[in-house]
Amino acid sequence: MQTVLDGKSLITAAMLAGTLPRGKLEHHGEAFETARAELALILHATQQQIEQDKTPAEIVGRLLSFLNGLHSKVHPDVWHALIPVAQNHPILKYFLEDPLTHWSFTKPRGYSGDAQLLDYIYCDPHVAESVANASEIGKALYSHTQNVPSCVAARERRDLLTRYVDEIAVKNGPQTEILAIAAGHLREANRSVALTEGRLKRWVALDQDPQSVGLIARDFQGTAVEAIDGSVRTVLTRGHKLGKFDFIYASGLYDYLAHNVAVKLTKTCLQMLKPNGTFLFANYAEGTPDAGYRETFMDWVLLLRSEVDMWNIVNASVDRNTVEARVFFGENRNVLYAVIEKRG
């Protein structure tokens, strides 16, 4: 089933690239040639390591480190031009043996960062068979890639969402209503005590991928979870009469949204909160050390943000006199969170 994209929700790297400011590469001619030469050396050295049968962990660990070094020092326009150079190198085939890298690069659902990719990152039982069927090299690579800092941060993010839901349910009682936007497979619900004990009125899971919506409906049948097919546009246009909520969150979505769309979505979500309700959004942070590998060999480009960027979204969306707001890093500083609590 081909997923229909609306340009405002989960999107492909090419679509995301259209939202990013890009200069002309000719302005960086010499810098590009220097960077391309450095990348060629990195790729050649990696190929030699593969031919010498070095361990997959050593090979991918070294590549991650060198790509991060290059990514962090070149201009974004130069880096963007280097991505296809890396992707067209013969060593790509080796790294595609890793089920996580393979799923991300080939995009079976037609877009980046889909829910099954997150299942690989979560080491979820739903992908255990796929991992078991990988080659020995693939399994060894996966043992490393699943534990890069951004993946560790994604698992922490999942567990943080569960804690927020359970704490808000304790505070508000059995009438608690939750909304997850771009819910994916809603894995954070698997460990929710409030859901298991029937202490939620409803947990609405909105996603634009029909496969994800179907899986949620199947896995959480008979619970307070309601799976709904819808996108950012659905929320912005109030396409569904969703009602009001105690807690709304968008944990893996803002990484794909330009500032103006992020502000519109934040404003809309705040209008959908009950008095004293809470809105949370998360975003991968600038400086994530695996961005170089992710953007090349995983073909997964994210809009990384700083603390200032997060505050800019918050401040453009609210009257700070009417809310309590905070921005904070996760434990390994790879993910940023913004939490806005509505006063009264």
Regions found by a protein language model. Name each.
Residues 2-77, 85-89, 144-168, 172-176, ...:
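Class I (Rossmann-like) S-adenosyl-L-methionine-dependent methyltransferase catalytic domain
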Residues 250-253:
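A short beta-strand submotif of the Rossmann-like class I SAM-dependent methyltransferase core
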